[in-house]
């Protein structure tokens, strides 16, 4: 049996804006038949915390990208969950990425860097009751976990980044780099730098131990200049 932590910004049936949520929600049951014990990490949106109910905190942060936070462990809808409870980042109206005005939250970089860092911390043994051998990050919102893990000195989980939709890459101004907590050498073409800015997905793909996508056909397509969205060379 291998322990795997799946990390995603949305998971069915709690929060869904697209197919990503369906895939991540179905993976644990599908992989259990292959001797994989999977827990799912996701942000502590109001709907997630309501479904989880009273759940113990298994890790505490005095400060996580702007405020205190905890990792909650529990079970809901047949899924074993680790939830990043950071109200300053995730207790908001709207969908996971947009406010009620339909615009992206200006601190989305901070919100999903926090999710990624929490996943990496679990991959470094922060939750003794569940130490994964693999951290499986889905799309740009979780991809930076691979970068945080790569800059770990000591025991760590291996990282897998899965691309569901290459059109969404998590691109931000270079000015956010200092707030990510990564070492200076990460700000490079052979790192998370992307056309003068920061690319969460690009950085995750660069630092991941393995990369997968949703089908063999899509894997071939995104390796071509026409469909690679600027990342085909990577």
Please annotate each region the language model reported.
Residues 1-234:
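Catalytic cores of nucleotide-sugar-dependent glycosyltransferases that transfer UDP/GDP/TDP-activated
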């Amino acid at each position: 049996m291998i322990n795997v932590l799946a990390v995603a910004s949305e998971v069915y049936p709690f929060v869904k804006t697209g197919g990503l949520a369906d895939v991540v929600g179905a993976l644990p049951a599908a992989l259990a038949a292959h001797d994989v014990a999977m827990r799912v990490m996701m942000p502590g949106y109001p709907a997630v915390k309501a479904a989880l109910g009273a759940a113990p905190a298994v890790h505490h942060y005095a400060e996580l990208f702007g405020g205190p936070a905890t990792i909650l462990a529990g079970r809901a809808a047949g899924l074993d969950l680790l939830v990043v409870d950071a109200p300053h980042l995730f207790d908001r109206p709207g969908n996971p990425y947009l406010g009620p005005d339909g615009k992206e939250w200006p601190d989305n970089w901070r919100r999903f860097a926090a999710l990624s860092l929490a996943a990496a911390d679990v991959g470094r043994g922060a939750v003794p009751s569940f130490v994964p051998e693999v951290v499986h990050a889905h799309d740009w919102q979780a991809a930076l976990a691979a970068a945080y893990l790569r800059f770990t000195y000591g025991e760590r989980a291996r990282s897998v980044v899965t691309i569901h939709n290459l059109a969404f890459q998590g691109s931000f101004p270079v000015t956010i780099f200092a707030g990510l907590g990564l070492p200076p050498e990460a700000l490079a073409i052979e790192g998370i730098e992307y056309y003068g800015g920061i690319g969460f997905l690009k950085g995750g793909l660069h630092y991941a131990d393995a990369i997968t996508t949703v089908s063999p056909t899509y894997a071939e397509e995104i390796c071509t200049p026409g469909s690679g969205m600027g990342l085909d060379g990577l």
